[in-house]
Amino acid sequence: MKLRILSLFIILLLFSTLSMAQDKPWKQHNKWIWGPSVGYQYQSGNFLKVSGWGLFAPNDFQYMKIDAGANFSWMEGKTTVIPELGFTYYLNDFVVFPFVKAELTPYTITPKVGASLFSIVDLGIGYGFDYNTKKNFKPIDGITVSVGVNIPLNFHIY
């Protein structure tokens, strides 16, 4: 029951934020679109990814996203939180945006390629390179597969 109420509250908050953004004249809009994201990644184990991001468009065909967040995991009998910075470069191809991405944690660097639906739902694949193994933790390296949902809070249609 609490989860339903929380979900309903979040949905109402998103719709009210989006509708308020539509009421502003074009000149008042910020060129950055920002919001939270949540996702799943497999890279030597399962990770829940939560972050905040900002996206801007230097022109009509390219988009760049910067994000910072945390990866949550339960491995080897304990919960682990790993901070992460990411940079994504999207090419606008109408509905499906191909992208390249780089993610950096204190332990790995992970280049990725993938496709995104309107830069809202991202599907990526890449390879993680472990450069500093965390103490009492297994190396986080190898093939990685991820899916993420980016929730724009100040998106405008025009």
Feature annotation, model-predicted:
Residues 140-158:
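Outer-membrane beta-barrel "beta-signal"
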Residues 36-40, 50-54, 70, 85-89, ...:
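Residues on the lipid-exposed face of transmembrane beta-strands in outer-membrane beta-barrel proteins
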Residues 32-42, 62-74, 93-107, 122-131:
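Transmembrane beta-strand segments that form the barrel wall of outer-membrane beta-barrel proteins
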Residues 47, 82, 97, 108, ...:
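Transmembrane beta-barrel architecture of outer-membrane proteins
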Residues 1-26:
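Bacterial Sec-dependent N-terminal signal peptides
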Residues 21-59, 65:
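Short glycine/proline- and aromatic-enriched beta-strand/turn motifs that initiate or cap beta-hairpins
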Residues 57-61, 92-95, 118-122, 152-154:
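Outer-membrane beta-barrel channels and translocator barrels
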